[in-house]
Amino acid sequence: MTKKPGGPGKNRAINMLKRGLPRVFPLVGVKRVVMSLLDGRGPVRFVLALITFFKFTALAPTKALLGRWRAVEKSVAMKHLTSFKRELGTLIDAVNKRGKKQNKRGGNESSIMWLASLAIVIACAGAMKLSNFQGKLLMTINNTDIADVIVIPTSKGENRCWVRAIDVGYMCEDTITYECPKLAVGNDPEDVDCWCDNQEVYVQYGRCTRTRHSKRSRRSVSVQTHGESSLVNKKEAWLDSTKATRYLMKTENWIIRNPGYAFLAAALGWMLGSNSGQRVVFTILLLLVAPAYSFNCLGMGNRDFIEGASGATWVDLVLEGDSCLTIMANDKPTLDVRMINIEASQLAEVRSYCYHASVTDISTVARCPTTGEAHNEKRADSSYVCKQGFTDRGWGNGCGLFGKGSIDTCAKFSCTSKAIGRTIQPENIKYEVGVFVHGTTTSENHGNYSAQVGASQAAKFTVTPNAPSITLKLGDYGEVTLDCEPRSGLNTEAFYVMTVGSKSFLVHREWFHDLSLPWTSPSSTAWRNRELLMEFEEAHATKQSVVALGSQEGGLHQALAGAIVVEYSSSVKLTSGHLKCRLKMDKLALKGTTYGMCTEKFSFAKNPADTGHGTVVIELTYSGSDGPCKIPIVSVASLNDMTPVGRLVTVNPFVATSSSNSKVLVEMEPPFGDSYIVVGRGDKQINHHWYKAGSTLGKAFSTTLKGAQRLAALGDTAWDFGSIGGVFNSIGKAVHQVFGGAFRTLFGGMSWITQGLMGALLLWMGVNARDRSIALAFLATGGVLVFLATNVHADTGCAIDITRKEMRCGSGIFVHNDVEAWVDRYKYLPETPRSLAKIVHKAHQEGVCGVRSVTRLEHQMWESVRDELNVLLKENAVDLSVVVNKPVGRYRSAPKRLSMTQEKFEMGWKAWGKSILFAPELANSTFVVDGPETKECPDERRAWNSMQIEDFGFGITSTRVWLKIREENTDECDGAIIGTAVKGHVAVHSDLSYWIESRLNDTWKLERAVFGEVKSCTWPETHTLWGDGVEESELIIPHTIAGPRSKHNRREGYKTQNQGPWDENGIVLDFDYCPGTKVTITEDCGKRGPSIRTTTDSGKLITDWCCRSCSLPPLRFRTENGCWYGMEIRPVRHDETTLVRSQVDAFNGEMIDPFSAGPSGDVSGHPGGPSQEVDGQIDDSCGFGGPTCADAWGHHLH
């Protein structure tokens, strides 16, 4: 009886518990067993046997099988594997016995075995070679030898060796040598891939393969990023992506700091666009272009025009790479002066870096524990790099004792690719300059240099530091002389030319020397720091592999992002450089001034062509034969009105030959808009309509931008900021000098009230105009005028008007007026008070107790932000207050510097509002700004000269100047507010503190100097006139208080005024008599000493003064407290106790005046004791028993 499923199994019709095995085909059963074993199921012995089978056949076991192998307990696995080992030993013995029985048989089989053995020996002889290494047998193998046992016959019998290395390739330079230890019977190999059974031998093989490169390390060398080059040049930097980001940040800052201009640009962009998309694009473009007028504009135009004044005899030119200057002066032919090439040759090799190395001939010597230290004989070879270490040794790798054994590995280093650094020497820089006359040039000769030289219309010359002057003969045009002063714009001591592969770069010297790569010097062949491009891998018992790093060329190229790319073969063409030349035109003359006018007809050989520089080139054909004759050509606004407009670039054009149909090229500059080029006279007159796009207003702005660009590019190199001299009022000069010149060029002669009224008039006309485009033009122009008239606008860069004694940084005027009072409209501000507060906190933690201001404007900045800084410090739980004290005397220097930080303090709106109304309480710790030196905060613990000008901004009442923390540690004054110029017989060094004026009267000499305050920075050499070969002892204003190292800072009869009254206020240095006094020159006068006031403590006037060899009128200092004389001028026989002396010593350290006995010397009469005379001054500084005069002060005398 059957039941439904679910009941007990025994009662079912089919009993599942007693069901028999199914009938299965035998092969299917075997397959199932094998598959279960492959899946890791089954008896352990079967699993281990299957794994052993896979090992012997070099097949990869399945993942499941390996998983089961890892899961087997150690004791169980060891038991089965030991039994396998016994079975294998039994099989080996059986084979050995079988071999002996067969040897006894003799006959034909013996002959076959002998031949087989001979073949094996011949094959081994062809593949394996035997030699000696460090007193032991060395076998050299290839990749075919590792498949079988290597048998080496020895005196002790056959030595069988097994090599299981996986890096065996074919023989090449990349070889490795190491020891195969002897393993006793029953010991398994451990941490070795080569072993023998009779005696140890060395194995050597090559590691090269035919399918892939040799093994190399995955590690790379860390190369510090080069960063953006500080050089101003016309070539793009390598992989430079920083400028775009930096410019976007600059645009953002400009919008925030100049909201009025940003609003105006947005309004103009909105009016210019006809739809929303265009308006957005125009607005973005205007906002991106606008900051270019304010700071750090680079990239010069190819051509600049300089129009000279009548009677000019010379002009100073500043030529840049690939630039051209067109010089026009009355009654002189027009000249083109072109910088053709700047080239440096004979570069001296400094150092070579290896960026791709190869490692060959690796050898390892190993020793067992207690057998001594391993020593590789290749250590004696300097081309090898060696490394010693220790490895685990024992029975499994040939040693009788377990422990640490010594190992010594050597590998040969060779450089595959290297980067070479070379230095440029100033005397090897050559400047190639061409001078071309705008004469009667035919179209065939135009651009043909050889033909123009043959016609004496061009000349080319080379300027070097050893040959800076040259006179050029220009035929009938006379001659020109050029006195040049090469200024490469490249500090050759700060840059190297580095060649990496096929590319060369101009790199910073410090970066080059800090590269972490193997290097060698030109005089040596040995590489230093070779281990940087090698990697010693983990040492095994007797073997250690050494690999080389891959090529570091890619890393070097990436690190060089921002460096300037140059072309180098045997010489290097420089793209950063300037040549300042004085072009003397006194012997230059116009040719053809006496020729008559051409009477026949002209025709245009070709249509007039635009040169791209605002000028037009006209090629004319003259049909007459009455040459040479002058060409009647003019540009007019209308054919009904023949009044000339525009100007001729080719002065006095003429036809040079009498042959008919001769062709002549003439260049002229037409006005903006519509005009007519008229050639000829009467009924033979021809004309051509010409339209020049643009406007006078736009031209003023574009030329201003070019001047700003040139000034920014010349910056640190050119002291004259452009072309000065006899053509001070030239167009090019005005462009070079002033950044905000467009507004002043057009409306500078009007008062701001007139400018505002004119703007209002234009706005009114725009509102009432019917034509939409005209209305928009009036509204835009009027809006610009009103806005500019009511704002003080400024840019980085300063211009000097010597006649008006005026210095302009943008339009923020810094005037020295007739009553000799300083009026400034500048306000210094920190980049952000939040970051400055964090910088102060960080400096205080580093032991800086305070700050010394460099100038009065910096002191005023600290005063203005003091309360805000203190609120920020308090809000961020910093127990520190900034205290600003009144400065005493001159602004002194200090040794420390504030350091930059990216962190900022935060402040809420509530605290900010409270800071406007209430000053915060004084904290327990203070950060002192200026004031007298105290024990709590001596000058040794103060910071100084930590800030520099970042940008100029705009304001209603003052020009705002933003300061940022300096990245470098320097004593130089900030060059952003320094202006230097020469005009005629006057030279000026000036900044926002000093006005130093020199005049030429037979010789150049200091005339006067006015000081807003006295500071302690040094005047930068890059902004110094005539600074070659100046001795500091001759500088009247000491260089330690920002006196320029210039020959303009000298006057005959006077030495450095290091003990002048520099701590006084309102100092004016000039050469005249103090009121009510007289000065006589006599040999009986006293020696130099500290400056003395002409009135005593009680106010009594000292009338009689003398000097030994000074020049008259005498040097005097006018201050708020009275009149002082220079150090050479002494009172005649007066009571010393009532004299008021200067207590200043402007020398560094504890130096005493080289021309006097120091502050303690006598001030009248003859000095006592041994003395010497220096330039007519009695000096007894040698009378103190110290060093000799020559030893002590020889470097001050000349």
UniProtKB/Swiss-Prot annotation:
Glycans are attached at N142, N448, N924, N1001. One of its GO terms (cellular component) is host cell endoplasmic reticulum membrane. The record marks R105, G106, A127, M128, R219, S220, S294, F295, A794, D795 as: Cleavage. GO terms for molecular function: protein dimerization activity; structural molecule activity. The chain crosses the membrane at residues 110-130, 254-274, 280-294, 747-767, 774-794. Residues 1151-1178 are annotated as: Disordered. Keywords: Capsid protein, Clathrin-mediated endocytosis of virus by host, Cleavage on pair of basic residues, Disulfide bond, Fusion of virus membrane with host endosomal membrane, Fusion of virus membrane with host membrane, Glycoprotein, Host endoplasmic reticulum, Host membrane, Host-virus interaction, Membrane, Secreted, Transmembrane, Transmembrane helix, Viral attachment to host cell, Viral envelope protein, Viral penetration into host cytoplasm, Virion, Virus endocytosis by host, Virus entry into host cell. Residues 106-127 form a propeptide. CDD domains: Flavi_E_C, Flavi_M. Residues 37-72 are annotated as: Hydrophobic. GO terms for biological process: clathrin-dependent endocytosis of virus by host cell; fusion of virus membrane with host endosome membrane; viral translational frameshifting; virion attachment to host cell. Disulfide bonds join C297-C324, C354-C410, C354-C415, C368-C399, C386-C410, C386-C415, C484-C581, C598-C629, C798-C809, C849-C937, C973-C1017, C1074-C1123, C1085-C1106, C1107-C1110. SUPFAM superfamilies: E set domains, Flavivirus capsid protein C, Viral glycoprotein, central and dimerisation domains. Residues 392-405 are annotated as: Fusion peptide. Genome polyprotein: Specific enzymatic cleavages in vivo yield mature proteins. Cleavages in the lumen of endoplasmic reticulum are performed by host signal peptidase, whereas cleavages in the cytoplasmic side are performed by serine protease NS3. Signal cleavage at the 2K-4B site requires a prior NS3 protease-mediated cleavage at the 4A-2K site. The keyword Secreted applies. Residues 2-15 are annotated as: Interaction with host EXOC1. The transmembrane domains of the small envelope protein M and envelope protein E contain an endoplasmic reticulum retention signal. This is Structural polyprotein. It comes from Japanese encephalitis virus (strain M28).
